Amino acid sequence: METQIKVEEVWETLKQVKDPELPTVSIVEMGMVKDVRCQGQAVEVEIIPTFVGCPALDLIKKDVVQHLKALFPEEQIKVRFVLDIPWTSDRISEEGRENLKKMGIAPPPREYQAGQKWIVECPYCHSPKTVMENLFGPTACRSILYCTKCKNPFEAIKPV
């Protein structure tokens, strides 16, 4: 199989690998996949963790290997977590942002600067009239907010 075709197939397959903590969003949509390389009988995927201590990393690695082995049963699959560049919330694709909203999770603002006021739009009614209930949500990457317009609590991805 031609290497370029194989690389494209790997990227397409990785779009099926969901973030275990955000099951409507793929690791590609989250901007976690840094690179894909195919050489001979080997496929290597480099993944940027959203947070260094993320407890889902082992599951993500297992899912990547499982999906790629189904496509390339004879290939050696290698998954590496890379820390040479940090993941930022700007890496989330537009499709990923929409899928987060469908799940009731507000995506982070684009081009957020540390120290800047964090304005979060409600994923249900799209109102900016929201308040932070708890900076610490169910995972390290999420916070809990409340919409004063539609009266719904919701989670938001922290901007980094």
Model-inferred region functions:
Residues 1-160:
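Domain-level signature for proteins that mediate thiol-based redox and metal-cofactor handling
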